[in-house]
Amino acid sequence: MTLPWNTFPGSTVPPVVPSVEDIIRMLVAGQQKIAIQNLLQSQSKEQVNGTSHDLQNWLTSLCISPSSSPTPSNASTSTIPAQMTNENVLHLQIQSQLFSNLGTPWFLNPEQHNKTNNAIRKRPKKEFICKYCARHFTKSYNLMIHERTHTNERPFHCETCGKSFRRQDHLRDHKYIHAKEKPHKCEICGKGFCQLRTLNVHRSCHHVQEPISETFMLGAIKFGKADSLLIDAEPLIDVTTI
């Protein structure tokens, strides 16, 4: 039985779990290492020392010189051995060049991925322009209804009185008059209306601001109109005479 990483019996330290980015980088590094080893093993010892023509062209495309030496660095911060063969130098330069060209995968950078998707999904808004007054509309139906105000076209006719309308919903509201139906009721006074827009106009009458009540002063006390009715109904009693 094997214990998880960095865990012991009775220990409360959570196990060390590598992140998704670390796993991806390890997989990519392993694949690159296998590819480079296969490439170098296919060459003979003489070709490794002098590098073949195909390998030299490929290294030139990566801006790597097979005979160059690594850049010196401090011994305290460097993880490169002091004595390195030409093959190790070549390995290091190829891996550093390949890793420098690697970008962050799309699943590790969701913000950039969302920006790309939003740019693709965003479509230009359609505009419908009236040929009479150049007014813009976002829907073709609204443009068609608007153009009837210029042409005075009324395709919807009432079978009872013969009156014509530009819109079908206007004809529907008009038919309530002949049927003596008033489906739209006022919630405040209960009055009925045939058309909803007429009910909306009626509702505004209930919200009219009431006039300010009259006030008057009696001595140093301020009274309103309702208080004056009480004063008239019940005369004041002089307590000094009791």
UniProtKB/Swiss-Prot annotation:
GO terms for biological process: negative regulation of transcription by RNA polymerase II; pattern specification process. Disruption phenotype: RNAi-mediated knockdown results in defects in feeding, and failed growth and development eventually leading to lethality at the larval stage of development. Morphological and functional defects around the pharyngeal intestinal valve and intestine boundary with multiple cavities surrounding the isthmus of the pharynx in 1 to 2 day old larvae, and accumulation of ingested bacteria in the anterior intestine. SUPFAM superfamilies: beta-beta-alpha zinc fingers. Gene3D superfamilies: Classic Zinc Finger. One of its GO terms (molecular function) is zinc ion binding. Its main location: nucleus. GO terms for cellular component: nucleus. It comes from the Eukaryota. Keywords: Developmental protein, DNA-binding, Metal-binding, Nucleus, Repeat, Transcription, Transcription regulation, Zinc, Zinc-finger. It is found in: Nucleus. InterPro entries: C2H2-ZF_Transcription_Reg, Znf_C2H2_sf, Znf_C2H2_type. A zinc finger (C2H2-type) spans 128-150, 156-178, 184-207. May function as transcription regulator. Essential for larval development. Required for morphogenesis and function of the digestive tract. Belongs to the Odd C2H2-type zinc-finger protein family. This is Protein odd-skipped-related 1. It comes from Caenorhabditis elegans. The gene is odd-1.
